[in-house]
UniProtKB/Swiss-Prot annotation:
It is a single-pass membrane protein. The chain crosses the membrane at residues 15-37. It comes from Escherichia coli. This is Protein MchX. The gene is mchX. It is found in: Cell inner membrane.
Length: 39
């Protein structure tokens, strides 16, 4: 039982981390595009 709840917590933190990474990737890509269009 304890193992199952631990696995769920790991899954939640992993999905949160991946969504944060995806968001930062999109933001940096947008910033890169913006700075390229400025020049």
């Amino acid at each position: 039982m304890e193992f199952a709840t631990n696995r769920v917590t790991v899954n939640d933190s992993r999905s949160a981390l991946s969504s944060t990474l995806l968001l930062s990737l999109i933001m940096s890509a947008t910033l890169l595009e913006y700075s390229l269009s400025m020049t």
